Amino acid sequence: MLFHAAEKTGHHFTIGAAGVDVFFVISGFIMWVISDRRSVTPVEFIADRARRIVPVYWLATGVMVAGALAGLFPNLVLTLEHVLASLFFVPARSPSSGEIWPVLVQGWTLNFEMLFYAVFAGSLFMPRNWRLPVVSGLFLALVIAGRVVAFDDAVMLTYTRPVILEFVAGMIIGEFWLKGRVPPLAVGSALFACSLGGFALIGVLGLPFDELTTGPLAVLLVIGVLSLEANGCVRALSLPGLLGDASYSIYLWHTFAISVVAKAGLAIGLGAPATMFAAVLSGTLIGIAAYMMLERPLLRRGRARRVTAGLAGRAAE
């Protein structure tokens, strides 16, 4: 969000985009750990992810489409093919820019997540000790194919990027976590500090800003934070907990608020630092509001339906 707020208000916070790399590592970690602690079938896994991800994303995409049709987003070019590809998480080139982006631009990360979900769900058919090697081998093969073959197709260009290995790294970290093999506090603190310093040096040294530089740093950051948590240095606080719960809604909706605030700040002559602060605050607040009024009620309704269906099924037996 800081990256988008800085971009819209004339600042530079390119390194903020590296949050995606951290997110992919965490995604692999969470899927691996949760699947080990709670038995779930491939169908149940996919259904659970779809219930969480799809409805709110479709709603946010619908708002973008409606806004474009109403003339609120003059730079957004719509085609039926691109809208459908966006809704069904198929990587496709945007008619607006030629980039491989969905209608809701930040949704490009969900295109990767859907690959992760599909492959991970498939791995649940296998014995546990096969899963990590098979997923790792598949993703490594895809990356090698991307280096060897000059793909032009948007799907293959997306799914052969080295960034997918960050998900595998998260799974590997999760396996070490489950075995209790976490770095001691001194090592974890050093890894955490090195990762933050490394992110800062990317801009200072003019290093390439891609997953080959940000990916390893994201891995170090996650390992460092896990070490801090395992050693009791991370406390559970209500505000960070709320932001974590609302993170998906913040991710989906923050750009709407940031765009409005950036334009308003420019119109009234508000200074760039104040505009950026207001943009970040508004993006956070709209995400929390969307979580409380949209995402959380939808999730609760879905859980209630599953409980009702389960009770009805047992009664029928």
From Swiss-Prot:
<keyword id="KW-0270">Exopolysaccharide synthesis</keyword>
<keyword id="KW-0472">Membrane</keyword>
<feature type="transmembrane region" description="Helical">
    <location>
        <begin position="132"/>
        <end position="152"/>
    </location>
</feature>
<keyword id="KW-1133">Transmembrane helix</keyword>
<dbReference type="InterPro" id="IPR050879">
    <property type="entry name" value="Acyltransferase_3"/>
</dbReference>
<comment type="similarity">
    <text>Belongs to the acyltransferase 3 family.</text>
</comment>
<comment type="function">
    <text>Required for the acetyl modification of the third sugar (glucose) of the octasaccharide subunit of succinoglycan (EPS I).</text>
</comment>
<protein>
    <recommendedName>
        <fullName>Exopolysaccharide production protein ExoZ</fullName>
    </recommendedName>
</protein>
<feature type="transmembrane region" description="Helical">
    <location>
        <begin position="206"/>
        <end position="226"/>
    </location>
</feature>
<feature type="transmembrane region" description="Helical">
    <location>
        <begin position="53"/>
        <end position="73"/>
    </location>
</feature>
<dbReference type="InterPro" id="IPR002656">
    <property type="entry name" value="Acyl_transf_3_dom"/>
</dbReference>
<feature type="transmembrane region" description="Helical">
    <location>
        <begin position="185"/>
        <end position="205"/>
    </location>
</feature>
<keyword id="KW-0614">Plasmid</keyword>
<feature type="transmembrane region" description="Helical">
    <location>
        <begin position="100"/>
        <end position="120"/>
    </location>
</feature>
<keyword id="KW-0536">Nodulation</keyword>
<feature type="transmembrane region" description="Helical">
    <location>
        <begin position="14"/>
        <end position="34"/>
    </location>
</feature>
<dbReference type="Pfam" id="PF01757">
    <property type="entry name" value="Acyl_transf_3"/>
</dbReference>
<keyword id="KW-0812">Transmembrane</keyword>
<dbReference type="GO" id="GO:0016747">
    <property type="term" value="F:acyltransferase activity, transferring groups other than amino-acyl groups"/>
</dbReference>
<dbReference type="GO" id="GO:0005886">
    <property type="term" value="C:plasma membrane"/>
</dbReference>
<feature type="transmembrane region" description="Helical">
    <location>
        <begin position="268"/>
        <end position="288"/>
    </location>
</feature>
<dbReference type="GO" id="GO:0000271">
    <property type="term" value="P:polysaccharide biosynthetic process"/>
</dbReference>
<keyword id="KW-1003">Cell membrane</keyword>
